[in-house]
Amino acid sequence: MLVLGIDSSGHTASCALIEDNLVLSEYSANIGLTHSQTLLPMVAEIFSRTGRSVSDLDAIAVSAGPGSFTGLRIGASTAKGLALGYGIPLIEVSTLEGLAKNVSDMGGISSCTETSGENMTVTAKDALYVHPIMDARRKQVYTGAFLNGTLVGEEEAIGIDELAGNINKTGGRHLFLGDAVPVYREYLMEHLTVAFSFASPQNLLQRASSVALIGMEKLKAGETVSSKDFRLSYIRKPQAEREKEASGLREFDITHDDPNKLKKSSTEDVLAARNYKIGEGSGYEDESIPENL
């Protein structure tokens, strides 16, 4: 089975093509360009290099959040455009689960660059908790704790101070990865009292191969959705939406593709319309999709 993986939930845009459990090709870029500029050309390059085409795909696995609202929509829009055009099912993959997959087979501490904490005596029987942390701004992170590849509890947006306090009560060993590591590395090193470490640079950020591998597992289990039913998971509402609710502002009118047609829309719709359109009528009928796709 052939699966395309896409992750544009953070600063890195990444796509990968896997066949069964073999990674045929992976392309990641963190070069300061917007994902709308880089993602589709990267996908085209992967198919060109491997001699495959979109029509060969059994499914497209997409990072469905949490993460950058705009980035998530660009990934979803790209996947939906391809899926609608070729009749391919989609697979929703948690961004945090994808990050945890980066280090799922590496044996914990041995895969890391630093280990610290007051309680440094660890044994093979000590539980290793993997904590993907993504910068959610305002001293918060998107995170979840994974034990043996399984989410423990729920994914959440939480203050970094509260997260550190909770982890200190847990014991065991703790591995951190994600784009919030460079932001809060020093804070964690200062405030954690348990054994902890950080993932090595090649595994620190999102990788589409991890998304695709999880997607392959879900495909075999029949866990696919149509383009129409695909949903992104933001965990928390955009700041504009929260401010609107706090101030009691009512919904307002915006224009979509047809300036003569107005409809009531929430701030979510406004952001989607201004940043990147997703779903049916995603705009792909007006864009040039490379012929080799």
Language-model segments: residues:
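Surface "functional belts" at beta-alpha junctions
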Residues: 22, 89-205, 234, 257, ...
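Residues at secondary-structure transition points
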Residues: 30-38, 69, 73, 77, ...
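A short, charged, Gly/Pro-tolerant segment at domain boundaries
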Residues: 228-242
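N-terminal beta-alpha supersecondary unit
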Residues: 1-64, 278, 293
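DPxDG-like acidic metal-binding loop motif
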Residues: 63-95
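Stable alpha-helical structural segments in soluble proteins, enriched in small hydrophobic residues
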Residues: 46-50, 85, 103, 208-219
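Glycine-rich phosphate-binding/hydrolytic loop that grips phosphoryl groups
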Residues: 201-232
